């Protein structure tokens, strides 16, 4: 196009009428020159590749002939393998336990028949004694050996059949349960391990299994009288059904060398019957049937109450929901009254200087 740009209109008209000039102009264009160069380069490349392929022609022919030979050898090996396989099947069919059992049974019956025929001939006198002894013993031995082999082979044949029958009668194994998919948002549930049984009870008891009084301080000298500690404890006990027996009230301590007397005792409390003494009546009978002599202090067979029990009490058990509550107002289990002195009244007779 650059060559046509500089030409005049007259030159262009002449060029249009000249076909040779147009062809020359097309061949001199750069596009056609590039295509021609690419064509020559492709031809040179193809020529070099063809020459290289011709160099591999000899090894290719040799490899092809080797492949043909190997294929022929393979066919021969396949035919030989088929022949060996047929022989193996023939031998294996002849050596099957069932086939061997049949052959042994036939041979056993045959040798047994021959031994019986030998015995009959010997009985008829056709066979001499020496020949009979030599042949009959060997025949019977062979017959017994074959019989034992037949029995053992029968056991071998029966075992696989029994195992197959048991396997056929057994139910098919159950498939494992399908695994449930766990949602991604839900954390995996951890199975709680069972707790071992503990030695402590599941509910704390309000009392000890071995009740005992707390250890106090060591006493030196005379012990002062002191009542038991008072613990408030509601109870369902409504009091004694029979008449109560008041405790004997200790009187003032006598002087040294003087014994106790009824005149020195304190008068009984109002509302309770006084303790019978020697002045008012006979004493309480003892276990042996002997009554105490009048003039000695009489001790009540029941411990002194004074509104407090003579032993430490336990706190009340906790109430559970649904437990029936008592409708009767709670009453103390002992009649009210002043606390008696600690222990029993002092013994009669001369007082011990340690008190």
Curated annotation (Swiss-Prot):
UniProt lists compositionally biased (Pro residues) regions at 170-186, 194-205, 321-355
Q: Give a GO cellular-component term.
A: ESCRT I complex
Q: What is the stated purpose of this protein? A: Component of the ESCRT-I complex, a regulator of vesicular trafficking process. Required for the sorting of endocytic ubiquitinated cargos into multivesicular bodies. May be involved in cell growth and differentiation.
Subunit info here reads:
Component of the ESCRT-I complex (endosomal sorting complex required for transport I) which consists of TSG101, VPS28, a VPS37 protein (VPS37A to -D) and MVB12A or MVB12B in a 1:1:1:1 stoichiometry. Interacts with TSG101, VPS28, MVB12A and MVB12B. Component of the ESCRT-I complex (endosomal sorting complex required for transport I) which consists of TSG101, VPS28, a VPS37 protein (VPS37A to -D) and UBAP1 in a 1:1:1:1 stoichiometry. Interacts with HGS and STAM2. Interacts with CEP55.
Which species is listed as the source?
Pongo abelii (Sumatran orangutan)
| Gene that encodes it | VPS37C
* Record-linked InterPro entries: ESCRT_assembly_dom, Mod_r
**PANTHER family (alphabetical):** VACUOLAR PROTEIN SORTING-ASSOCIATED PROTEIN 37, VACUOLAR PROTEIN SORTING-ASSOCIATED PROTEIN 37C
Q: What is this protein called?
A: Vacuolar protein sorting-associated protein 37C
Which keywords does the record carry?
A: Endosome, Membrane, Phosphoprotein, Protein transport, Transport
Q: Which domain of life is it from?
A: Eukaryota
Q: List the disulfide bonds.
A: none
